[in-house]
A protein has these predicted regions:
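Fe(II)/2-oxoglutarate oxygenase catalytic core
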Residues: 1-154, 158-184
Length: 184
């Protein structure tokens, strides 16, 4: 059991950077969970980390701060590619854990040193827009923060969370998962 289920930073990202991140999105595709099913019409777009190193440079220090200040102190070594998520009216994301069904799913990708033999340890959501209604991020049954553009939240990847239905406007967020060796 963790003492702090999340750690957040208000106005961590400038509105200019939020707009810049949204502009990185190419073609969106349907978002899936690890069981391969599509859960509503949420759109996601992968951001090429090789082309957008500045995103890692921006968010890595916040992740380190959250990991330390929340008291998790997880061994984190790398991160996945960033994903920009777009939610339209009626879109939502069902309750799930990012660490997959058993919370300890180890990546078996020998050709990728950043992912191979690692598990998701810390999840991140950056709020990129705020001109929408609904769409609250709920973590472990609670809504921990306001959805203002520029806000940033981290939580252990094994904690359940969901995005409530968007009732108007478009919700943009940026997600990533920080990885390390399997929990012992």
């Amino acid at each position: 059991m963790v003492k702090n289920k999340w750690w957040y930073f208000n106005k961590a990202i400038s509105r200019e950077d939020c707009k810049k991140i949204i502009s990185l999105a190419g073609e969106y595709r349907h978002a899936e969970l690890s069981d391969g099913k599509v859960y509503r019409d949420v759109r996601k777009c992968l951001v090429d980390g090789k082309q957008e190193q500045w995103l890692y440079d921006l968010f890595w220090p916040y992740m380190l701060g959250a990991n330390e200040q929340a008291g998790w102190k997880y061994d984190v070594e790398s991160a996945e590619d960033f994903q920009i998520l777009k939610y339209n009216k009626g879109d939502f994301y069902v309750t799930h854990e990012d660490g997959s069904g058993d919370h300890l799913s180890v990546y078996d990708m020998p050709d990728n040193k950043f992912l191979n033999n690692k598990v998701r340890k810390i999840s991140m959501v950056a709020f990129l827009s705020d001109d929408y209604e609904g769409g609250e991020l709920e973590i472990s049954g609670e809504i921990p923060m306001t959805r203002e553009a520029g806000n940033l939240i981290f939580f252990p990847s094994f904690i359940s969370h969901q995005v409530k239905p968007v009732t108007s406007g478009e919700r943009f967020s940026l997600s990533n998962w920080f990885l390390g060796p399997p929990f012992k």
